[in-house]
């Protein structure tokens, strides 16, 4: 079986001391590839370095100025295009809306989101969307901007079923983390149950969101298998089918083979 971690932050300092061991555990678990996300200016350099060094497992890069970061110089379509045109950067993201950490007039956040979508369209690259307590508004913008043309995924999905279906209708996919293994995530598991497997991806969002039985510890790409196991249990499917379909979905999204 082959798995993919569609969203990781193994470029973060939490992995600075043992990244080779993390990659070896990833390989041993059957996780053949991962997306490495850069969220700040300059972070793309480490992402590009990791992608260039990767063999097995394969790493693919993504970059965007994260929607939580208000107190930084605003980006531009030109800056996003310049950074994300690198061949090591396979996707634009994570970008989107965050109503959990950011309050007040968030027009700047929506404008930033639209700039990333414009750049992604120009580059012909897919978009990784961060939407926290803002899923419905994010999907509205994605639909308005016809982001399905480039392909997009709502990462670390935590919204309701109607919004997830609207995301799929707009041409996107929905990705789930280890949160679906949490005891209090019954409503989210029902969303997983109702969605077609052909529209799902799996991720760790490591070092955050470690699944049960690792909850409270540092997350890592090998643990994406626990997410796949939970989806298989929820949907009463074999783990092999969940692995195969979610990996195919990722390849279609990222427009890469491995």
What are these regions (language model features)?
Residues 1-258:
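Mid-domain alpha/beta scaffold segments of enzyme catalytic cores
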